[in-house]
Amino acid sequence: MDREQRIKEIIADQLGVEVDKLTPDAKFVEDLGADSLDVVELIMSFEEEFNIEIPDEDAEKIKTVGDVINYLNEKLK
């Protein structure tokens, strides 16, 4: 499974949404119904899954599915 698909599975599982709703511009809060705690838990899940630390200042900039895919692809080169 590629990284993008795994990211989408984590989001779908945590937020209880269908993977096909996870377009790159889908916003976690506005489009996918996440609250601030959900977003924190998502960041923690990405950190655990990909064995990476995401600083708070970076996490605050991650607002969409595309943001997290681009961020992780950049950090995990």
Swiss-Prot record:
Carrier domain mapped to chain residues: 1-76
Metal-binding keyword on record: no
Keyword check for Transmembrane: no
Pfam family, one: PP-binding
Any one GO CC term of the record: membrane
Processing and modification events after translation: 4'-phosphopantetheine is transferred from CoA to a specific serine of apo-ACP by AcpS. This modification is essential for activity because fatty acids are bound in thioester linkage to the sulfhydryl of the prosthetic group.
Modified residues (O-(pantetheine 4'-phosphoryl)serine): S36
Keywords in alphabetical order: Cytoplasm, Fatty acid biosynthesis, Fatty acid metabolism, Lipid biosynthesis, Lipid metabolism, Phosphopantetheine, Phosphoprotein
Pathway assigned in UniProt: Lipid metabolism; fatty acid biosynthesis
Subcellular location as annotated: Cytoplasm
Biological-process GO terms, alphabetical: lipid A biosynthetic process
HAMAP family reported in the protein's UniProt record: Acyl_carrier
PANTHER family associated with the record: ACYL CARRIER PROTEIN, CARRIER DOMAIN-CONTAINING PROTEIN
Function: Carrier of the growing fatty acid chain in fatty acid biosynthesis.
The protein's name: Acyl carrier protein
Organism of derivation: Hydrogenobaculum sp. (strain Y04AAS1)
Designated gene of the protein: acpP
